Amino acid sequence: MAPRAIRLGVLTPSSNTSLEPLTQAMIASLPNVTVHFSRFPVTKISLDDDALQQFHNDKILAAAQLLADAGVDIIGWSGTSSGWLGFEADETLCAAITEATGIPATTSVLALNKACQEFGVKKLGFVTPYMDNVQEAITKTYATIGIDATKERHLRMSKNTTFADIDEPTLDEMVADVVARKAPAISTFCTNLRAAQRVTYWEKEHGVPVFDTVSTVVWDMLRYCQVDMSPLKDWGVLFTK
Protein backbone atom coordinates (compact mmCIF):
# COMPACT_ATOMS: atom_id res chain seq x y z
CA MET A 1 0.00 0.00 0.00
CA ALA A 2 1.29 3.48 -0.91
CA PRO A 3 2.03 5.81 2.01
CA ARG A 4 -0.88 7.96 3.08
CA ALA A 5 -0.91 11.51 1.74
CA ILE A 6 -0.12 14.31 4.16
CA ARG A 7 -3.36 16.07 5.06
CA LEU A 8 -3.43 19.77 5.81
CA GLY A 9 -6.46 21.16 7.63
CA VAL A 10 -7.29 24.82 7.08
CA LEU A 11 -9.68 26.94 9.14
CA THR A 12 -11.50 29.41 6.91
CA PRO A 13 -13.63 32.52 7.55
CA SER A 14 -17.12 31.75 6.23
CA SER A 15 -17.21 34.77 3.91
CA ASN A 16 -13.74 34.17 2.44
CA THR A 17 -13.71 33.20 -1.25
CA SER A 18 -10.00 33.64 -2.00
CA LEU A 19 -7.97 31.44 0.32
CA GLU A 20 -9.41 28.07 -0.72
CA PRO A 21 -8.68 28.29 -4.47
CA LEU A 22 -5.29 29.88 -3.80
CA THR A 23 -4.34 27.21 -1.27
CA GLN A 24 -5.53 24.44 -3.58
CA ALA A 25 -3.49 25.93 -6.42
CA MET A 26 -0.34 25.88 -4.29
CA ILE A 27 -0.88 22.33 -3.08
CA ALA A 28 -1.65 21.08 -6.61
CA SER A 29 2.08 20.82 -7.34
CA LEU A 30 2.66 18.56 -4.31
CA PRO A 31 1.44 15.07 -5.27
CA ASN A 32 1.50 13.60 -1.76
CA VAL A 33 -0.31 16.46 0.00
CA THR A 34 -4.04 17.16 0.26
CA VAL A 35 -5.79 20.13 1.84
CA HIS A 36 -9.14 20.19 3.63
CA PHE A 37 -11.17 23.18 4.82
CA SER A 38 -13.58 23.95 7.64
CA ARG A 39 -15.47 27.23 8.04
CA PHE A 40 -16.75 29.30 10.91
CA PRO A 41 -18.79 32.53 10.79
CA VAL A 42 -16.91 35.72 9.85
CA THR A 43 -18.58 38.45 7.80
CA LYS A 44 -16.88 41.73 8.67
CA ILE A 45 -13.58 43.03 9.96
CA SER A 46 -13.73 45.87 12.45
CA LEU A 47 -13.11 46.62 16.11
CA ASP A 48 -16.84 46.65 16.91
CA ASP A 49 -17.86 44.19 19.61
CA ASP A 50 -19.92 42.00 17.27
CA ALA A 51 -17.01 41.74 14.84
CA LEU A 52 -14.54 40.85 17.58
CA GLN A 53 -16.89 38.17 18.95
CA GLN A 54 -16.59 36.31 15.64
CA PHE A 55 -13.13 35.19 16.74
CA HIS A 56 -14.11 33.62 20.06
CA ASN A 57 -12.43 30.25 20.29
CA ASP A 58 -15.57 28.13 20.78
CA LYS A 59 -16.71 28.50 17.16
CA ILE A 60 -13.20 28.06 15.83
CA LEU A 61 -12.67 24.94 17.94
CA ALA A 62 -15.88 23.42 16.58
CA ALA A 63 -14.56 23.92 13.05
CA ALA A 64 -11.18 22.48 14.07
CA GLN A 65 -12.87 19.37 15.45
CA LEU A 66 -14.41 18.72 12.03
CA LEU A 67 -10.91 18.80 10.53
CA ALA A 68 -9.74 16.41 13.23
CA ASP A 69 -12.47 14.01 12.07
CA ALA A 70 -10.60 13.85 8.75
CA GLY A 71 -7.35 12.85 10.43
CA VAL A 72 -5.40 15.88 9.27
CA ASP A 73 -1.73 16.10 10.24
CA ILE A 74 -1.77 19.78 11.17
CA ILE A 75 -4.39 22.52 11.43
CA GLY A 76 -3.78 26.05 10.20
CA TRP A 77 -5.92 29.11 10.86
CA SER A 78 -5.78 30.99 7.55
CA GLY A 79 -6.68 34.37 8.96
CA THR A 80 -5.08 37.52 10.28
CA SER A 81 -7.21 38.40 13.32
CA SER A 82 -4.34 38.29 15.81
CA GLY A 83 -2.88 41.24 13.95
CA TRP A 84 -5.41 43.41 15.76
CA LEU A 85 -6.37 41.10 18.65
CA GLY A 86 -2.75 40.52 19.71
CA PHE A 87 -0.50 37.56 18.96
CA GLU A 88 -1.48 35.86 22.22
CA ALA A 89 -4.92 35.27 20.68
CA ASP A 90 -3.37 32.94 18.10
CA GLU A 91 -1.04 31.34 20.62
CA THR A 92 -3.99 30.56 22.89
CA LEU A 93 -6.05 29.29 19.96
CA CYS A 94 -3.30 26.93 18.78
CA ALA A 95 -2.87 25.53 22.29
CA ALA A 96 -6.63 25.03 22.59
CA ILE A 97 -6.84 23.26 19.23
CA THR A 98 -4.04 20.88 20.16
CA GLU A 99 -5.55 20.23 23.58
CA ALA A 100 -8.96 19.47 22.05
CA THR A 101 -7.81 17.42 19.06
CA GLY A 102 -4.26 16.24 19.72
CA ILE A 103 -3.24 17.87 16.43
CA PRO A 104 -0.57 20.60 16.14
CA ALA A 105 -1.76 23.99 14.95
CA THR A 106 -0.42 27.20 13.46
CA THR A 107 -1.80 30.40 11.95
CA SER A 108 -1.12 32.80 9.10
CA VAL A 109 0.14 35.46 11.50
CA LEU A 110 2.34 33.25 13.68
CA ALA A 111 3.79 31.85 10.46
CA LEU A 112 4.39 35.37 9.13
CA ASN A 113 6.28 36.18 12.31
CA LYS A 114 8.43 33.07 11.82
CA ALA A 115 9.11 34.18 8.25
CA CYS A 116 10.24 37.59 9.51
CA GLN A 117 12.67 35.81 11.84
CA GLU A 118 13.95 33.58 9.03
CA PHE A 119 14.56 36.57 6.75
CA GLY A 120 15.79 38.94 9.46
CA VAL A 121 12.96 41.40 8.85
CA LYS A 122 12.69 44.28 11.32
CA LYS A 123 10.69 46.62 9.08
CA LEU A 124 7.66 45.15 7.32
CA GLY A 125 5.41 47.03 4.92
CA PHE A 126 1.72 46.17 5.02
CA VAL A 127 -0.90 46.11 2.25
CA THR A 128 -4.41 45.52 3.61
CA PRO A 129 -8.06 46.31 2.90
CA TYR A 130 -8.81 47.28 6.50
CA MET A 131 -10.28 50.27 8.33
CA ASP A 132 -8.06 52.93 9.91
CA ASN A 133 -8.43 51.68 13.48
CA VAL A 134 -7.78 48.07 12.50
CA GLN A 135 -4.62 49.10 10.67
CA GLU A 136 -3.49 51.16 13.65
CA ALA A 137 -4.00 48.13 15.90
CA ILE A 138 -1.88 45.98 13.56
CA THR A 139 0.94 48.53 13.67
CA LYS A 140 0.85 48.55 17.48
CA THR A 141 0.74 44.74 17.66
CA TYR A 142 3.85 44.39 15.50
CA ALA A 143 5.68 46.95 17.59
CA THR A 144 5.40 44.50 20.51
CA ILE A 145 7.82 42.16 18.74
CA GLY A 146 10.14 44.90 17.53
CA ILE A 147 8.86 45.09 13.95
CA ASP A 148 8.23 48.51 12.43
CA ALA A 149 4.91 48.24 10.55
CA THR A 150 4.42 51.95 9.89
CA LYS A 151 4.99 51.71 6.13
CA GLU A 152 1.54 50.64 4.95
CA ARG A 153 -1.44 51.15 2.65
CA HIS A 154 -5.01 50.20 3.52
CA LEU A 155 -8.35 50.67 1.78
CA ARG A 156 -10.73 51.47 4.69
CA MET A 157 -13.03 48.52 3.98
CA SER A 158 -14.81 46.26 6.48
CA LYS A 159 -17.13 43.86 4.60
CA ASN A 160 -15.14 40.68 4.16
CA THR A 161 -16.77 39.54 0.90
CA THR A 162 -15.64 42.73 -0.83
CA PHE A 163 -11.97 42.11 -0.06
CA ALA A 164 -11.92 39.39 -2.72
CA ASP A 165 -13.03 41.94 -5.34
CA ILE A 166 -9.87 44.04 -5.03
CA ASP A 167 -8.15 43.65 -8.40
CA GLU A 168 -4.51 43.11 -9.28
CA PRO A 169 -3.89 46.66 -10.61
CA THR A 170 -5.04 48.06 -7.25
CA LEU A 171 -2.78 45.69 -5.34
CA ASP A 172 0.11 46.40 -7.74
CA GLU A 173 -0.18 50.13 -7.02
CA MET A 174 -0.41 49.60 -3.26
CA VAL A 175 2.62 47.32 -3.15
CA ALA A 176 4.65 49.71 -5.32
CA ASP A 177 3.73 52.62 -3.04
CA VAL A 178 4.76 50.81 0.13
CA VAL A 179 8.04 49.70 -1.46
CA ALA A 180 8.66 53.32 -2.49
CA ARG A 181 8.44 54.23 1.21
CA LYS A 182 11.55 52.09 1.74
CA ALA A 183 9.89 48.99 3.16
CA PRO A 184 12.49 46.18 2.83
CA ALA A 185 9.81 43.46 2.91
CA ILE A 186 6.05 43.42 2.31
CA SER A 187 3.08 41.50 3.66
CA THR A 188 -0.25 41.33 1.87
CA PHE A 189 -2.04 40.93 5.17
CA CYS A 190 -5.53 39.52 4.58
CA THR A 191 -6.42 36.00 3.49
CA ASN A 192 -9.36 37.19 1.38
CA LEU A 193 -7.08 39.20 -0.89
CA ARG A 194 -6.40 37.51 -4.23
CA ALA A 195 -2.72 38.28 -3.88
CA ALA A 196 -0.67 35.10 -3.43
CA GLN A 197 -0.55 34.45 -7.17
CA ARG A 198 1.05 37.89 -7.63
CA VAL A 199 3.90 37.49 -5.14
CA THR A 200 6.59 36.36 -7.57
CA TYR A 201 5.79 39.27 -9.90
CA TRP A 202 6.16 41.78 -7.06
CA GLU A 203 9.37 40.19 -5.83
CA LYS A 204 10.92 40.41 -9.30
CA GLU A 205 9.57 43.90 -9.92
CA HIS A 206 10.67 45.42 -6.61
CA GLY A 207 13.48 43.20 -5.33
CA VAL A 208 11.98 42.62 -1.88
CA PRO A 209 10.45 39.51 -0.29
CA VAL A 210 6.65 39.47 -0.16
CA PHE A 211 4.89 37.38 2.48
CA ASP A 212 1.24 36.77 1.66
CA THR A 213 -0.83 35.50 4.58
CA VAL A 214 -2.49 32.72 2.57
CA SER A 215 1.02 31.53 1.72
CA THR A 216 2.56 31.86 5.18
CA VAL A 217 0.26 29.35 6.86
CA VAL A 218 0.75 26.86 4.02
CA TRP A 219 4.52 27.30 4.31
CA ASP A 220 4.50 26.70 8.06
CA MET A 221 2.28 23.63 7.82
CA LEU A 222 4.48 22.13 5.11
CA ARG A 223 7.60 22.88 7.16
CA TYR A 224 6.12 21.06 10.13
CA CYS A 225 5.27 18.07 7.93
CA GLN A 226 8.79 18.14 6.41
CA VAL A 227 7.51 18.44 2.85
CA ASP A 228 9.93 19.38 0.06
CA MET A 229 8.67 22.82 -1.00
CA SER A 230 10.91 23.26 -4.04
CA PRO A 231 7.90 22.78 -6.40
CA LEU A 232 6.41 25.93 -4.82
CA LYS A 233 9.30 28.26 -5.68
CA ASP A 234 7.09 30.08 -8.21
CA TRP A 235 4.85 31.17 -5.31
CA GLY A 236 7.62 33.29 -3.81
CA VAL A 237 11.00 33.30 -2.11
CA LEU A 238 9.32 32.24 1.15
CA PHE A 239 9.07 28.68 -0.15
CA THR A 240 12.84 28.47 -0.64
CA LYS A 241 13.44 28.71 3.13
Description of each model-found segment:
Residues 1-62, 132-167:
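N-terminal glycine-rich anion-binding loop in soluble enzyme alpha/beta folds
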Residues 64-106:
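Glycine/small-residue-rich loop that forms an oxyanion/phosphate-binding "nest" at active or ligand-binding sites
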Residues 173-205, 217-218:
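Hydrophobic alpha-helical
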Residues 57-70, 170-183:
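Short, well-structured alpha-helical segments in soluble
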